Amino acid sequence: MTLASQIATQLLDIKAVYLKPEDPFTWASGIKSPIYTDNRVTLSYPKTRDLIENGFVETIRAHFPEVEVIAGTATAGIPHGAIIADKMTLPFAYIRSKPKDHGAGNQIEGRVLKGQKMVIIEDLISTGGSVLDAAAAASREGADVLGVVAIFTYELPKASQNFKEAGIKLITLSNYTELIAVAKLQGYITNDGLHLLKKFKEDQVNWQQ
């Protein structure tokens, strides 16, 4: 079993991911979605957490061997990033969504040196907007952002477009395609549900029609 399928299995088992193609969720954006993900839940399950953190470390070593600092996005990327940095004996920092409105007004907490090679940790990629904002903030502070590594992606076309336009490499430990395949195999969804889930990936607006 691949790492992607192992993580997909764990996310379903611990109910970090819910699939309701016949009774969709409403995202904050207003989009009706057949999937809801809360990867913060993974922190409460040592087996799942260990699988994810080891997966992060292996992936970073394989794709970004020159990394010098790990950064987590606030707030979801902070705990994972801190664990990864500890496992890799690397410095850690975290990136706020916007600068503080008091004190030193920092957006990056921790010490990042000019030119330091950074990998940013995120838990979930939908359109990628927030983590790309974090990457831009890190670059403005002088970091050399090598890429983003995340637990899971919905594989939305908008995300691919956003990362391409930003020139930022994205790698995820698991993904939507892998998850719905595992969900079908393990009986979480029906054939009709799988069909709807596949339609959502291609068209987030008209998938129910």
From Swiss-Prot:
GO molecular function, one term: magnesium ion binding
Chain positions recorded as 5-phospho-alpha-D-ribose 1-diphosphate binding sites: R96, K100, H102, E122, D123, L124, I125, S126, T127, G128, G129, S130
Annotated InterPro entries: OPRT, Or_phspho_trans_dom, PRibTrfase_dom, PRTase-like
Record EC number: 2.4.2.10
Protein name in the entry: Orotate phosphoribosyltransferase
Family: Belongs to the purine/pyrimidine phosphoribosyltransferase family. PyrE subfamily.
Pfam families xrefs: Pribosyltran
Subunit structure: Homodimer.
Assigned keywords, A-Z: Glycosyltransferase, Magnesium, Pyrimidine biosynthesis, Transferase
Catalytically driven reaction(s): orotidine 5'-phosphate + diphosphate = orotate + 5-phospho-alpha-D-ribose 1-diphosphate
Native source organism of the sequence: Streptococcus pyogenes serotype M3 (strain ATCC BAA-595 / MGAS315)
Free-text function comment from the UniProt entry: Catalyzes the transfer of a ribosyl phosphate group from 5-phosphoribose 1-diphosphate to orotate, leading to the formation of orotidine monophosphate (OMP).
GO BP, sorted A to Z: 'de novo' UMP biosynthetic process; pyrimidine nucleobase biosynthetic process
Positions contributing to orotate binding: S126
Cofactor list: Mg(2+)
SUPFAM superfamilies: PRTase-like
PROSITE patterns linked to this entry: PUR_PYR_PR_TRANSFER
UniProt pathway: Pyrimidine metabolism; UMP biosynthesis via de novo pathway; UMP from orotate: step 1/2
